[in-house]
Amino acid sequence: GTCLIDEHMFDKDALIFDNGQITKAGITLPDGTPYVEISCEGFPNFGIWSAIGAPFVCLEPWMGRCDNTGYEGELSEKPNINALKPAEVFDKSYMISIK
């Protein structure tokens, strides 16, 4: 789908998408011409945000995210938390295309 970004869209914080809802996102110019696109298969969370008054928007694939309001559980119980053993490696990547 498409979403028009306006100056107040992030006044209450980031837009957060869970459960792998977003695998590709992009920004277009006002005339609809593609400007930038991010492909991010396999990331459980995706954030779209901007600082108030900032001249930019961030598109970020996340492997985890901040707590929901009122969360009081342990760090190890958070959704999508990754725990690595000593010397274990976790590798993940995404692609950004500038049009």
Regions found by a protein language model. Name each.
Residues G1-E41:
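Active-site/ligand-binding surface loops and adjacent short beta/alpha elements
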Residues F17, I27-T28, I48-S50, K85-P86:
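A general structural signal for short secondary-structure junctions and capping/turn motifs
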Residues L29-G70:
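Glycine-rich active-site loops that engage anionic ligands at enzyme catalytic sites
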Residues N82-I98:
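Short Pro-Gly-centered flexible turn/kink motifs
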Residues L75-I81:
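Short alpha-helix capping/helix-loop boundary micro-motifs
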